[in-house]
Amino acid sequence: MQTIYTKITDIKGNLITVEAEGASLGELVQIERADGRSSYASVLRFDARKVTLQVFGGTSGLSTGDKVIFLGRPMEVIYGDSLLGRRFNGTGKPIDHEDECFGEPIPITTPSFNPVCRIVPREMVRTNIPMIDMFNCLVKSQKIPIFSSSGENHNALLMRIAAQTDADIVIIGGMGLTFVDYNFFVEESQRLGFADKCVKFIHKAVDAPVECVLIPDMALACAERFALEQQKNVLVLLTDMTAFADALKEIAITMDQIPANRGYPGSLYSDLAVRYEKAVDIAQGGSITLISVTTMPGDDITHPVPDNTGFITEGQFYLKDNRIDPFGSLSRLKQLVIGKKTREDHGDLANALIRLYADSRKSAERMSMGFKLSNWDKKLLAFSELFEARLMSLEVNIPLEEALDIGWKILSQSFHSEEVGIKEQLIQKYWPKACLHK
């Protein structure tokens, strides 16, 4: 039996307080307004009989005498094949002007996958982006963010990864998107040809922050069901997790919580971790690979959001100057696939290229300070130009094997074979024959 309450004692921002009994955290609530409209809310906090609710869609037009009905179940989202190709807002309602979506309602707040049923990641996810495939391999079921400096086109990188991987289903969770960003996701997924296997959960910048915090939960709840019940390999793309954290901060301030670092709630680490831990490779088949975007305000890597994220995830891609910076990027799972799922020369070649590129940066610094350059410095500078143009540029779109071959060609055009520090047996097998004795 549902109990109806009509005594709203406080309205503050998107939060209301009502006197009620028997409420549970996360419980879904229906609010019936005097003008006949209805909206939903969820239980955020309770203290004795005072229950705080976060209202989806805002509290505009709400009065203290409106009916509040506790539904006895958590927030749910529709799951099923009918989701594919569709777009939904932060409350799970379609926003693509198509028919109502039908399927199985599932709760959006579920525990992380049972560790006993997880398996060690072992499959490489190919993106055809050399700075990922060659130097920081993406592994199936990995959770990894893209740390993006201001002004970087991280959304284009996300869509390119989505189009060029072999994921069965792509789920995009957009938070705090401008109309331009939202339109880009819609049009780009159609242009790249994966719109029919893509589900989009979208929170726009003009929407209530309460809806923003639901986006990752809805995206990951659906991904978990697709992976578990249909054995699908699901790629989840979340952008922007800084907007997600800002929404948490706004809600916490409205609730008069004591802030922690830079105004963010003390639960920020846990709030991020519980979402990232949904990434999984399931023993019975199916997987969830999670790539997020975390913008860094003021390019500050010590900002609470990227700082906490770095302790949770399995590496990061550092997007800077329209390139993936090799020195700020890391994949903690790459050793599981390099040389095991890729060519034998992969590890040695990648290490040599990065080592020489690091040396070239020192030579460039000496040149900028007016020091006289040695012949070795000149070789390094010539090498860095080739390396940046043929492997680092995000315009490059080639398979891993071709990237490895190009890496050998760049080395042979810049150095003698004995100068690169690679094992002789690999030199004999892969060094371009025309340059073998150079």
From Swiss-Prot:
It comes from Chlamydia trachomatis serovar L2 (strain ATCC VR-902B / DSM 19102 / 434/Bu). Belongs to the ATPase alpha/beta chains family. Produces ATP from ADP in the presence of a proton gradient across the membrane. The V-type beta chain is a regulatory subunit. HAMAP family: ATP_synth_B_arch. The lineage of its organism: Bacteria, Pseudomonadati, Chlamydiota, Chlamydiia, Chlamydiales. GO terms for molecular function: ATP binding; proton-transporting ATP synthase activity, rotational mechanism. One of its GO terms (biological process) is proton motive force-driven plasma membrane ATP synthesis. This is V-type ATP synthase beta chain. Keywords: ATP synthesis, Hydrogen ion transport, Ion transport, Transport. It comes from the Bacteria.
